[in-house]
C-alpha cells in the first residue's frame, strides 16, 4: 500500500524553495482540515478545488501528483 499523499508531501517541505511541491507542502501543513490519511486523487483534488482555505494552481498539483505516484 502506498503511503498517504500528505505523508509524502510533508517530506517535500522546504521553506526556502520555490518548487511547487514545497509551496503546496507548506500550505497543506497549515491547513488543519486537509485529508491526511488518503492516497486517493479524487478526494485530494476535490478538497483543493472546493474546500481548501488556500488557493493553489491545480495544473501544478497534477504534476506533483505524478511525482508522488513515481515514488
From Swiss-Prot:
Q: Name one Pfam family in it.
A: YozE_SAM_like
Per its UniProt record, what Gene3D superfamilies does this chain match?
A: YozE SAM-like (1.10.150.260)
Q: Which domain of life is it from?
A: Bacteria
Q: Which InterPro entries match?
A: UPF0346, YozE_SAM-like, YozE_SAM-like_sf
Which protein family is named in the record?
Belongs to the UPF0346 family.
Report the protein name in the record.
Answer: UPF0346 protein SZO_05010
Q: Which organism is it from?
A: Streptococcus equi subsp. zooepidemicus (strain H70)
Upper classification of the organism? Bacteria, Bacillati, Bacillota, Bacilli, Lactobacillales
Amino acid at each position: 500500500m502506498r503511503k498517504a499523499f500528505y505523508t509524502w508531501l510533508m517530506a517535500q517541505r522546504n521553506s526556502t524553495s520555490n518548487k511547487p511541491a514545497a509551496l503546496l507542502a507548506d500550505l497543506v501543513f497549515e491547513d488543519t482540515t486537509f485529508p491526511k490519511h488518503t492516497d486517493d486523487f479524487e478526494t485530494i483534488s476535490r478538497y483543493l478545488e472546493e474546500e481548501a482555505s488556500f488557493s493553489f494552481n491545480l495544473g501544478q498539483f497534477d504534476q506533483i501528483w505524478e511525482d508522488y505516484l513515481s515514488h
